Curated annotation (Swiss-Prot):
Enzyme Commission no: 6.1.1.11
Matches recorded under HAMAP family: Ser_tRNA_synth_type1
Keywords in alphabetical order: Aminoacyl-tRNA synthetase, ATP-binding, Cytoplasm, Ligase, Nucleotide-binding, Protein biosynthesis
UniProt function note: Catalyzes the attachment of serine to tRNA(Ser). Is also able to aminoacylate tRNA(Sec) with serine, to form the misacylated tRNA L-seryl-tRNA(Sec), which will be further converted into selenocysteinyl-tRNA(Sec).
Organism the protein comes from: Methylorubrum extorquens (strain PA1)
Domain notes: Consists of two distinct domains, a catalytic core and a N-terminal extension that is involved in tRNA binding.
Location of this chain's protein in the cell: Cytoplasm
Residues that coordinate or bind ATP: R262, A263, E264, E349, I350, S351, S352
Domain of life: Bacteria
Record protein name field: Serine--tRNA ligase
Amino acid sequence: MHDIRAIRENPEAFDRDLERRGLAPLSAELIALDDARKGAVSAAQAAQERRNALSKEIGAAKKAKDEARATELMAEVARLKEEAPGLEAAQGEAAKALDERLAAIPNRPKDDVPPGADEHGNVEYRRFDSSRERLAQGRQHFELGEATGLMDFEAAAKLSGSRFVVLKGQLARLERALGQFMLDLHTGEHGYTEVVPPVLVREEAMFGTAQLPKFRDDQFAAGENFWLIPTAEVPLTNLVRESILAEDELPLRFTALTPCFRAEAGAAGRDTRGMLRQHQFNKVELVSITAPEKSAEEHERMLACAEAVLQKLDLTYRVMTLCTGDMGFASQKTYDIEVWVPGQQTYREISSCSVCGEFQARRMNARYRAKEGRGVGFVHTLNGSGVAVGRALIAVMENYQNPDGSVTIPSALQPYMGGLTRIEGPKN
């Protein structure tokens, strides 16, 4: 959510940032809506002030025994009372029109975000190469999984339709191991507090993190006012909703392993086989709440925490700084981590780490009280995948596959697998 006062103070800068996002200028429209809101407020206030003044005049007229004047004034008061509901309604409608327009506008990109229209404008930030020899070519994860009978898309389709999977046996255990490994890393080494949040949230929570109203069609609704979370970012960030934190409490760092649900699982016809794009998947999420001057530093820290997962798994990856045309609606700046998948001979996104500034905090009314009497301001919010568990499973399967169809278990995961060192391939 944007600050209309900041827009009024520097409309040219606001429009320049929208232009970087590929949008037309909107400051004039927003200022006109705000003028209408102010006009409605002024009209309601003027009517109330007039009623207050008339009440005093009526008292004076009665004291002077001027009944005619008192009757005339009371008639005007009655008229103003009749008009009051309409003035209040106009005030509410004007405020709603402004708020709805502001809520539909994406966040302003930071100055150092590279320009670009789509993913082709993204810029490599850094990379990490595995100590293991890169496979020149390999089987895709679904070929490996289906051959063992431990990855069953046909059974999932009978249960739920397309873009679901049933994992069995050691593959199910491997996915569970990945999630537990990530949680232990983030809580034990990175200072995050583990949270087990609801996966059903109210509409206000989805609005707070900006999934609603713009991305309503991409979500799963459940009942009159419940939504299945598309990411644990929603409940974790909303933990500070409608609160005022002490600056000494910051930063807050939360992590959670949850199922995530997305009605729109990706572009039509893309990644139709396998686990890359699903309606339901597990993900470890990282969320930080900081003071404004600390958010840029926290963004780099969060990125490093997500990278540590892949480094300990010894997986090749690269970090991309997303351009203005590819970053998310609520983001000021985003880093994507893309892991190498030999089956496709390409990099695929496995984590996205974003700093949102006060954009979400304004929608949630999440504030903090600064030290030394510097007043109350909005916190900054950050979120990142730490990482997507299903995609980590894909990366492990494809990068650790063997010619016989077996999969070697990375050493970091073996303690979570009861000492198992490999998942056997299909028996001939």
